[in-house]
Amino acid sequence: MFIPNDRPSVLQLPKHEKDSTAADIKSIVANRDRRLIAVATNDAIYIWLANPQLLLCSVGVIDANFKETRGELKEIYWKPDSTSIAVTTNQCKILIYNLDLRDDEQCYNFTDSADPYFQRNSPELFIKGSRPTAHLHPTIIINLADIPTCCVPSRDEFLVCLQNGFTHHVTWTGEIIASLSFRASSIPFSVDQLQSKSENITSKSTYIFDAVYAPLLGGFAIVLSDGQGALLTSNDPNFAPNAILGVWAPNMKDATCCDVNHKFLLILFGCKNGDVCAYNIDELNGSLVQSFRVAPKVTNGPDLTNRLGPVHRITALANGYGFGAIWSPLSGAHALPRLVAVFTSFGAQSFCNLEGVVEEDQNDRYTAIEWGPEGFQLWLGTENELMMQPFVRSASCSSPAMEHCDRAVLMSDSQVLISAARDREAEACAPHSVWDHITVTHEYLSSNWPLRYASTDRNYKHLVVAGDQGMAYCSLSNRRWKIFGNETQEKNLLVTGGVFIWNDDVIGVVGVAADTDKSHLSFYPISQRLDSRYASVVDLEHKSVMSVLRDDVCAVFDISAQITLYKLTAHLETGRDAFTKVSTEIVTVIRINEIVPHPTCIVSLQMTQLNLDVRGKLSPAFYSSIDTVLVNISGRLITLSVNEDGKLHQPMVIASYVEKMWHDRCQVSQSTQSQNQDLPWKNHRRNGSNVSIQSVSTSTTSEPSSPMNQSCSSHLSNALWIACGAKGIKVWMPLVPGKRNLATQEMTFIAKRIMLPFELDIYPIVISAKDCLAMGVESQLQHVARASRNQGQMESITMYGLHRNSEVFVHHLLRQLLKRNLGVFALELAGACRSLPHFTHALELLLHGVLEEEATSSEPIPDPLLPRCVAFIHEFPEFLKTVAHCARKTELALWRTLFDVTGSPNALFEECLQLKQLENAASFVIVLQNLETTEVSMDQAARLVKEALEEKKWTIAKEMVRFARSIGSEDIDAFFRTPPPSAKTSLSRRPTVSSPSADSSTEFVINRFQAGAAGGRLNKVRHSQSTEQKDAPRKDSIGGSSKDKMALSWGLSGELSPQLATNRLAAKMTSILEDHAWHLLNNYWLLDLGFFWSELQFDLLGLLETRRKQISLSPKTTNENCFLIEDFALALTRLHAQFSWPYPLIGSQFVHQIEKKLGNIRVSQSTASLNGLLNDSLDNIKKPKARKLERTVVDLNGARSRIRETDIEASEEDVEIQEAVLERVRGSAVELAPVIDRSPSTSSSMNHHAPLAPPSPSSCDSRSLAGDCYQNTDFLVGEKSSRGNLQSSHQLELLLSLFSQTATIDWIFLFCLLSRDERKLRQEINVSMVRRAGEKSFARVRFACSELSRWAVEKCCGYVALLQAFDAHLAVVAEQAGCADLKFSPDNENRKASQKTSADDPKRGRRRADSGSSKLNNSFSNPKLNGMNGGRRERSRSADRAHKSVKRYDDVVCAEDALEKANEEGCSIM
């Protein structure tokens, strides 16, 4: 795989005449080793050095008479030894130039200045590579009878084709060999080389337009002037005219150019319609068989391909791993931008320059193309300029062992790029673009450019690279490079078969010694410097061209078509410099010369284990766990295995058109893998449809886990993955259904494999079988703006960046198995993949692909796959989610087909409601709106909204309301909305993209939590969830996540306007929302009301205004009409629970005030803890005896219960008596300094188990709702009383501002009391507020203050002093408003009835009351009780179902009486 990287280099061509026009590049050709690049324009020849890009020499045609007589230059050709070049013209001439290269003389030499400041000190500034001087000398001009069309150079002569139909053999000295000349019309052509009858071309004017020498195919690939393609073969090595036979390329009538891929034995033809067609030779009859036919694809601009003209030129890589092509624009159409594309060997497109291009007015086009050394450079010529684009390729092209890496490893001419580890990709903001760039040290690269081999160890600790000579390796942890210290040793080592790292501490090199020309296998220890003294050298019989490593076995393939397997053994060399020595032992020698046409045709070589155990008996193997050798010969994947007699089985071709292959057993054996990793399949056990595979290792095995929990099934771990270019991906999967013999308890396997083809949108370079992911790399065009050199203007430059992409393929495998009626294996495979995060998305892709293909088919399908696919998905709990998502992303015309198989959408909707899958139910509502009647869809939508509101799925409710309001009244009344699909419906394929998983049920993204405009933008509903993510249980106010509470603290200003109902469904939704808002307000769920207000953009201001008017008109009506606060104590306790707001502690000064009033009293340990005085010591108090006491506990919903416990004897340090004077705070007359306490606040018995008590707002690091006003109440409630955090304070502040706008005075009073904010109380409750709210409402607040005072005495004395201060302010306001004499007398019967309704109505608050009570019960109960009965937790009670032993605060007359009564009973002050 070759893709561009970085930006291209534009090279300037010097002009030989002042008045000459811009260079019109006609041809670019590289010499044999591709170090020299020859460029021909219409009037000049240039010789460039490939690296660095230096112009060595140039020759220009200046004489006008010469141009007229000889013509303009056209094509240029190299002599194989690079000593001469031949140039054709358009005037029947061929010019031959001699090239004089002098390696002993270097050009472009730099001379350092005498000034030391201008001298080169860095080694990168010195060019060590060869820069020979070059001189072109014209020697021969060959006159021809007609214009030459093409030439084919060889060592002693070159073939010249003319437009008159003749073809001549011309020597490099200018002589024409007349005896070997022939005419195209005299050549017999046939469709094969054996049986068919040959015929000559009838037209005398037909000539050879283009020709390429194909020695491994036995002749020349040609293109005739009439567009036909053929292969010229001959049994005569000199190609005598009488021995030539032409073989037609079938169905090739519009060829324009051709080239040959020697490694894969392919003939490439460019066509007039823009396609590239490839042919290979059939070994049976010698005919040409079409391998593939491809055309460039532009994902983001398919209209550009409509202007595609003929292929102008095509060129294959020298190593055969790809080819590039350029196109001409279509005549008569709009100008096509410059187009160049690169494909893999079998036609998979890896790069097209039109992806992401900004189309501009470009009049020029690419006129020439040529590859540089090793394919790392692509030279392109246009009508105006010459450019060179750098490329990178996969490291596995030259190192087969790198095919099985779990990371993407790419290499350029001077760098190695390694992708980040999968487990570390989450740390990067753009992990797909992060690469580890390892630049090879300049000391090695300057004389050995370019890189040819690169390899890493399995743990990516070391990297070894090799260029022309020697090698170098790097420690990836510290980026330190090591090269040969002796330069002679480096130059003596010529790497021919690759490099590898064995055992993480030894580097293996397969090469040739330059001085002796003998091949050897050398090992160098990493612990020592690179030196021949420490090398372990093994002589090889023949020159080796490829090597591969697996475990402790190294396989070497040499030019005699022999594979030798060496067993490697390491031992420590003793001595002062101890280092690792490696000894080898030949295990197996495999000769395959009969099936290998040439050593160049070997693409890759792998050792693996394919055969599975049969009844516990190991299959025959070459060595240990190596029973199969895989050889890719020109794209044919052949298996070599041994029989029980030690002889080779007949070689078997398992796949054709193979470019790459992956197999988990190729890099490491299963036994080694089981030792390194804790794999769950060491034994085989059949359990239902779940299968695991037994390891070959004989180590001790343990009971395996279910394959449902395995990360990779045995099918995938033993599968062979094959990339076939344009033909897609194939997987050779074993089918291993295990059966347990109850009598013998032996394992039996059905040793069968099946080839499953499928296609991917990317070209994979890494296949991760355990994750079912294919990783690819693409080069994306990026436009960068920079300042221009001319007048400071901005200009745009383009460059390419490498980006990794991944694709899921498990749905392709499931589909192929279901298609072949292998549902049992599909269930096994899916069961093993259920833990994958993209499994649900894979099921969706499976259903969507089958549905779209079968529903849009114009022909009836005899055996439809959709019913089988639906039945398969129904086996998994993700069935409803899969169907819902598939329906949402599919055209409406296909819904009928889908739900005819899956069942009625109404039934699926009901099932979603039962399973609380509200996200999926929302998708089915949209389906119902299009398929069912109006009444059905309206009823179901209303049910869903109600359920979503109860479950606090705010986003679902919001989207359903938005959906209802978006429907026009004329649409909702229409009965038929979606016609049934036609059988001939033609629909475009829409990609299904998995939306990110998110639990948005309580995601309180505040965009409108304050009086905000209702016309704000609404977020999309995202339904996708990960496989592990189950439907979250309903969360109450105190069970909500911190994310919900933090979001509640956001807000923005504006006026909230109600949405206008435009249809019946929208009106019904509005009614539901109003009912739910009343429900939340009546049950005192203010936090949920805030979320409800924010997410659904509800007109809460209008609702509260309605409430205010009803209360002002008739404040004594029932709670069902005006929603009064009937139980202020219950409302206060629920506010504490919802906002995680701690209860106030009694102040020490307040204790002294009571102490003075009541005399010496005994304070229990709980009271001392309540006051934060547990660590103070007193000497004047006697130790009280242990005694029984009753302590009252308040739960979440205000329920009271008395718990008996034995109070431990308090020590003298448990109590403290202080004196203080209780003064009324008027305004800010009393200013107290803030108390900074960084120690954790002392908890009372009520909040001992409060989870994560927030820090005190009095801390200098905290910020509170009331600001400095907390300082005025600290002496009342205790300096160490903790308050809510900043987040809760903001939430309270937003709600308080809302209630202030609507004069909701009762809730204003409770919020000020909760936040202990007397200053806020004075700001909010004043004379103007009383007039707005009404005197009767204000009288009710004063009554509530007295009621809460009675409750505080019994339940929480920390509120007693605070309520006294609040009551004093209310009295002042009443006096100023002239309503001091107005009293509020509640209707006892109505109040008791409402209390009973609140407790007994299961629809109005039981769920919310019970949902969070257990959590707060832990916070308010005695810690000793939590450990009773073996950790059994007592079930909390609702406030309205209080225990009968609890005394209601209605019986309490006043605070003084309560204190006296408590003293008589021996109770402590709470």
Curated annotation (Swiss-Prot):
Coiled coil: none
Name under which the protein is recorded: Guanine nucleotide exchange factor subunit R06F6.8
Family: Belongs to the RIC1 family.
Purpose: Probable component of a guanine nucleotide exchange factor (GEF) that may be required for efficient fusion of endosome-derived vesicles with the Golgi.
Places the protein is found: Membrane
Any one cellular-component term (Gene Ontology): membrane
Organism for this UniProt entry: Caenorhabditis elegans
A single GO BP: positive regulation of GTPase activity
Biased composition (Low complexity): 689-707
Composition bias, Basic and acidic residues: 1028-1045, 1385-1403, 1431-1447
Record field: compositional bias (Polar residues): 983-1001, 1411-1424
Region entry Disordered, spans: 673-710, 975-1001, 1017-1045, 1238-1259, 1385-1447
Protein origin, superkingdom: Eukaryota
Keyword Kinase: no
GO MF term list: guanyl-nucleotide exchange factor activity; small GTPase binding
Subunit structure: Component of a guanine nucleotide exchange factor (GEF) complex.
Membrane topology listed for this record: Single-pass membrane protein
Alphabetical UniProt keywords: Membrane, Repeat, Transmembrane, Transmembrane helix, WD repeat
WD repeat spans: 20-58, 68-107, 472-512
Transmembrane segments: 1294-1314
One Pfam family cited in the UniProt record for this chain: RIC1
Entry keyword Transmembrane helix: yes
